[in-house]
């Protein structure tokens, strides 16, 4: 993946800076594949399994983190193909056919959209829970509808990439299909629906949460409200996700803005290619950072993990109910 892009034949591609940047990004990718991928697979899988094994104690934030964990597993599975395989790189260990490339692109887009949607909905639902505790909208019983909305919306938004894939095979027979091969239009849709809209939703929710936090209301004495650690987890997750995904969406936005036929000098084109590669690397790294935040900030996760291990140890045998789990269910009732 890591190269100076299409200007390998230009003078700047042979400069020491270009070679050093390529080498540095290659080392980072190897470190991520060697350490980040196992961490991401392990913690994301534990996050999903621990919450599914403790459905009775799941809260709405847990549902969104499960969605982000599943998306993280998808991103982790795609990481080796992206970080080591694109055909334009001198460092590539293998090349991808056009069909495989578009398939990976669709999966990557779906995972990124699920991550951003879940982050935005986490912020909005946290505000609802703070403003109106025990509401139906923030109820965990809406899990099926929420997951359907998040994943269904991500798939529909990525449909433009699917149309591009189909039209690349039938354009010789259907002239109108050639109009759907505009990848810049697909990128613009992803930037608008996958980044701008969730970003505005998060900013709106954080502003409302901040305003509620300054107000002293009788609801603040309600012991059934969300644990304060959830607020820290929310802020850390929002900052992490948008911090790691913003460079990637900015690179897509730049591609859209520079697709009007304007030429870019070779020197700047090389810098932009390296910046795009680094942005995609940061996007992949989000899949390993988020479950670590959940692990170390969410106070309920260690208990869920213990119950998961207990169930795995018991197997098909009947296990005695966990007292801590019963207390947590009673507290949420």
Curated annotation (Swiss-Prot):
<feature type="topological domain" description="Cytoplasmic">
    <location>
        <begin position="210"/>
        <end position="232"/>
    </location>
</feature>
<feature type="topological domain" description="Cytoplasmic">
    <location>
        <begin position="44"/>
        <end position="64"/>
    </location>
</feature>
<feature type="topological domain" description="Extracellular">
    <location>
        <begin position="167"/>
        <end position="188"/>
    </location>
</feature>
<feature type="topological domain" description="Cytoplasmic">
    <location>
        <begin position="299"/>
        <end position="333"/>
    </location>
</feature>
<dbReference type="GO" id="GO:0009615">
    <property type="term" value="P:response to virus"/>
</dbReference>
<dbReference type="GO" id="GO:0045540">
    <property type="term" value="P:regulation of cholesterol biosynthetic process"/>
</dbReference>
<dbReference type="GO" id="GO:0035456">
    <property type="term" value="P:response to interferon-beta"/>
</dbReference>
<feature type="transmembrane region" description="Helical; Name=1">
    <location>
        <begin position="23"/>
        <end position="43"/>
    </location>
</feature>
<keyword id="KW-1003">Cell membrane</keyword>
<dbReference type="GO" id="GO:0051607">
    <property type="term" value="P:defense response to virus"/>
</dbReference>
<dbReference type="InterPro" id="IPR000276">
    <property type="entry name" value="GPCR_Rhodpsn"/>
</dbReference>
<feature type="transmembrane region" description="Helical; Name=3">
    <location>
        <begin position="102"/>
        <end position="122"/>
    </location>
</feature>
<feature type="transmembrane region" description="Helical; Name=2">
    <location>
        <begin position="65"/>
        <end position="85"/>
    </location>
</feature>
<feature type="transmembrane region" description="Helical; Name=4">
    <location>
        <begin position="146"/>
        <end position="166"/>
    </location>
</feature>
<keyword id="KW-0325">Glycoprotein</keyword>
<keyword id="KW-1133">Transmembrane helix</keyword>
<dbReference type="GO" id="GO:0004930">
    <property type="term" value="F:G protein-coupled receptor activity"/>
</dbReference>
<dbReference type="GO" id="GO:0034341">
    <property type="term" value="P:response to type II interferon"/>
</dbReference>
<feature type="transmembrane region" description="Helical; Name=7">
    <location>
        <begin position="278"/>
        <end position="298"/>
    </location>
</feature>
<dbReference type="InterPro" id="IPR017452">
    <property type="entry name" value="GPCR_Rhodpsn_7TM"/>
</dbReference>
<feature type="topological domain" description="Cytoplasmic">
    <location>
        <begin position="123"/>
        <end position="145"/>
    </location>
</feature>
<dbReference type="GO" id="GO:0007193">
    <property type="term" value="P:adenylate cyclase-inhibiting G protein-coupled receptor signaling pathway"/>
</dbReference>
<keyword id="KW-0675">Receptor</keyword>
<keyword id="KW-0807">Transducer</keyword>
<feature type="topological domain" description="Extracellular">
    <location>
        <begin position="86"/>
        <end position="101"/>
    </location>
</feature>
<feature type="transmembrane region" description="Helical; Name=6">
    <location>
        <begin position="233"/>
        <end position="253"/>
    </location>
</feature>
<dbReference type="InterPro" id="IPR037487">
    <property type="entry name" value="GPR146"/>
</dbReference>
<dbReference type="Pfam" id="PF00001">
    <property type="entry name" value="7tm_1"/>
</dbReference>
<keyword id="KW-0297">G-protein coupled receptor</keyword>
<comment type="function">
    <text>GPCR receptor required for the regulation of plasma cholesterol levels. Receptor for CHLSN, a gut derived hormone which mediates an inhibitory effect of intestinal cholesterol absorption on hepatic cholesterol synthesis. Cholesin-binding exerts an antagonistic effect by inhibiting PKA signaling and suppressing SREBF2-controlled cholesterol in the liver.</text>
</comment>
<comment type="similarity">
    <text>Belongs to the G-protein coupled receptor 1 family.</text>
</comment>
<protein>
    <recommendedName>
        <fullName>G-protein coupled receptor 146</fullName>
    </recommendedName>
</protein>
<feature type="topological domain" description="Extracellular">
    <location>
        <begin position="254"/>
        <end position="277"/>
    </location>
</feature>
<feature type="glycosylation site" description="N-linked (GlcNAc...) asparagine">
    <location>
        <position position="8"/>
    </location>
</feature>
<keyword id="KW-0812">Transmembrane</keyword>
<dbReference type="InterPro" id="IPR047143">
    <property type="entry name" value="GPER1-like"/>
</dbReference>
<feature type="transmembrane region" description="Helical; Name=5">
    <location>
        <begin position="189"/>
        <end position="209"/>
    </location>
</feature>
<feature type="topological domain" description="Extracellular">
    <location>
        <begin position="1"/>
        <end position="22"/>
    </location>
</feature>
<dbReference type="GO" id="GO:0005886">
    <property type="term" value="C:plasma membrane"/>
</dbReference>
<keyword id="KW-0472">Membrane</keyword>
